[in-house]
């Protein structure tokens, strides 16, 4: 039986989010609707999640001493990592000492904090199909890996990066050195390690939101949302839609792969499992033990969106992954480099049928920074995609 206290009281149920961007913001709102006291942590002040939480804290989350000191001072019931750039050894130590419960587990946070841990788990421990890959620590190793194993074309990514940063495609030998330099510039930490992956000849890629939550029996069960299709540019998502049609054999295989990975990681919560699909063949790509950016579409497609599913699951509550309507999301970009922008055209965007928008409240805009998202539902995915894209195009951030 789950008991939830009253916020700001001695018996409050307290949840700390490490990382308070747009996804964390929605998780915090979902938790507050369930009566949870929330603590939003980020590396900079006035992050989107900090604007809605009961408490806001700003620290260097990659500093183990700062992270430990904050957790020991706040004593939350749960610590929920919402980004990868965290001092995970400190989380593992605190969990082992019984100081706090990490969602889904401290081990999962460590394994998924970079591409090496999770790729080795999927391919080498679990034997799941993946693209050919090698890890490299120098330009010379990268050249050797491409010539000896991976071949052309291939993709280079820092082992620690997000939202496509530092990711590039290599078509021939002349691209190798620029790709290495770009990967070094896109890493989240001072780390010269990269992964180089051979190209998979896939028809499409999906995100399969996978939820580990307690059912009526009290046992942890695995449930799946309908597959989410998405389009990326330079490794960063620009639109997503749900459901994405796929053969039953491929869907079954996708669920088998997602279940194998998430069961091994353990704990409770939502996982964004990314997969490549060609016909009935499926390859594992990545997994995040938290809501996924492509999953923002669920705010208009599901009875419980990915943030509500995550909040319920980590609190030990039942979940419902039922789809209620086809829908789509489209990114609203900053368009300008400025602080404290204003948004023109919101009224015109919301005049598009069956649409909604989310403006994230990021204090600083960049040309290619994701500042919001347009959402649309319709009788079919194609109509929803057109409407979401149209609504997004009508919102214009402006420097003042």
Curated annotation (Swiss-Prot):
Pathway: Purine metabolism; IMP biosynthesis via de novo pathway; N(2)-formyl-N(1)-(5-phospho-D-ribosyl)glycinamide from N(1)-(5-phospho-D-ribosyl)glycinamide (formate route): step 1/1. It comes from the Bacteria. GO terms for biological process: 'de novo' IMP biosynthetic process. Pfam families: ATP-grasp (PF02222), PurT_C (PF21244), RS_preATP-grasp-like (PF22660). The keyword Flavoprotein does not apply. The keyword Metal-binding applies. Keywords: ATP-binding, Ligase, Magnesium, Metal-binding, Nucleotide-binding, Purine biosynthesis. GO terms for molecular function: ATP binding; magnesium ion binding; phosphoribosylglycinamide formyltransferase 2 activity; phosphoribosylglycinamide formyltransferase activity. InterPro entries: ATP-grasp, ATP-grasp_carboxylate-amine, ATP_grasp_subdomain_1, PreATP-grasp_dom_sf, PurT, PurT/PurK_preATP-grasp, PurT_C, Rudment_hybrid_motif. It catalyses: N(1)-(5-phospho-beta-D-ribosyl)glycinamide + formate + ATP = N(2)-formyl-N(1)-(5-phospho-beta-D-ribosyl)glycinamide + ADP + phosphate + H(+). GO terms for cellular component: cytosol. Its EC number is 6.3.1.21. Mg(2+) binds at residues 274, 286. ATP binds at residues 115, 157, 162-167, 197-200, 205. Residues 120-315 form the ATP-grasp domain. N(1)-(5-phospho-beta-D-ribosyl)glycinamide binds at residues 22-23, 82, 293, 362, 369-370. Involved in the de novo purine biosynthesis. Catalyzes the transfer of formate to 5-phospho-ribosyl-glycinamide (GAR), producing 5-phospho-ribosyl-N-formylglycinamide (FGAR). Formate is provided by PurU via hydrolysis of 10-formyl-tetrahydrofolate. Belongs to the PurK/PurT family. Homodimer. PANTHER family: FORMATE-DEPENDENT PHOSPHORIBOSYLGLYCINAMIDE FORMYLTRANSFERASE (PTHR43055:SF1). This is Formate-dependent phosphoribosylglycinamide formyltransferase.
